[in-house]
Amino acid sequence: MPPSNSTFDTCFHIHMVSDSTGETLMEVMRASVAQFEGTTPLEHLYALVRSSKQLDRVLDEVEAYPGVIMYTIVNADLRRELETRCVELGVPAIAILDPMLATLSAYLGRPVASRAGAQRSLDADYYRRIDALNYAMAHDDGQGDDFEGADIVLLGVSRTSKTPTSVYLAHRGFRAANIPLVKDVPIPEAVFSLRNPLVVGLTASPERIVQIRRNRLLSLNEDRDTNYIDDFAVREEILFAKRLYAKHKWPTIDVTRRSIEETAAKIINLLMEKRNMTV
């Protein structure tokens, strides 16, 4: 039974069943639920469900806590079993990849790939993201020196979201290094001769940077009488960075009013454009 309308937040159970890690399901579910104000999903994630026995345990949980089921299961027999049981339980089931797969199949004139190939692809994607995350951690804040192995190299003065953006890009499978820009301190010479990676300069408004830096110093209980948060000094830092970006024709992104996700999306678009130009 669907939840009733109320002046309070509507809580409901949502079950995500995947034969892989379930990350795709989680992202789609949260993006979808965000479109409905006043709702709070009670999330149940079941990953690596690849047998009837595993599915039985999932459905026992669904029976105990009825709600919407979202799934990405490619095994035809397991799908039929899940769909049949959902009808019996009277709960809606959504195969989130079906519309995309059906459209691609019709457009390409080819059937959907077999189980094993699809799973290998999913596994490869998982390990690619793990590798990217390890790379981001080893090349955070100017560490490391093998920048040619990166997909993306981010530059920026302190507090321009370099590290969180690098980590988010890593979760998307892109190897990202980030290098801090400090006025009158040279950056690694290797950056100027990079051929494979996309080099991107991050910037933000002086007011935004000063605000973030002040909050950081306050949280660390450190001295706030410093050039680190001096308006004029910060403006000089930003100007130095912008001149560097312009000199080397590196694309620049102002992160002042962008979320990490929006910044990363812009960077990925720039990377795809660069790769398309070199094909």
From Swiss-Prot:
GO terms for molecular function: ADP binding; ATP binding; phosphotransferase activity, phosphate group as acceptor; protein serine/threonine kinase activity. Disulfide bonds: none annotated. Its EC number is 2.7.11.32, 2.7.4.27. It catalyses: N(tele)-phospho-L-histidyl/L-threonyl-[pyruvate, phosphate dikinase] + ADP = N(tele)-phospho-L-histidyl/O-phospho-L-threonyl-[pyruvate, phosphate dikinase] + AMP + H(+); N(tele)-phospho-L-histidyl/O-phospho-L-threonyl-[pyruvate, phosphate dikinase] + phosphate + H(+) = N(tele)-phospho-L-histidyl/L-threonyl-[pyruvate, phosphate dikinase] + diphosphate. The keyword rRNA-binding does not apply. Signal peptide: none annotated. InterPro entries: Kinase-pyrophosphorylase, P-loop_NTPase, PPDK_reg. The keyword Kinase applies. Keywords: Kinase, Nucleotide-binding, Serine/threonine-protein kinase, Transferase. ADP binds at G156, V157, S158, R159, T160, S161, K162, T163. Bifunctional serine/threonine kinase and phosphorylase involved in the regulation of the pyruvate, phosphate dikinase (PPDK) by catalyzing its phosphorylation/dephosphorylation. Belongs to the pyruvate, phosphate/water dikinase regulatory protein family. PDRP subfamily. This is Putative pyruvate, phosphate dikinase regulatory protein. It comes from Maricaulis maris (strain MCS10) (Caulobacter maris). The lineage of its organism: Bacteria, Pseudomonadati, Pseudomonadota, Alphaproteobacteria, Maricaulales.
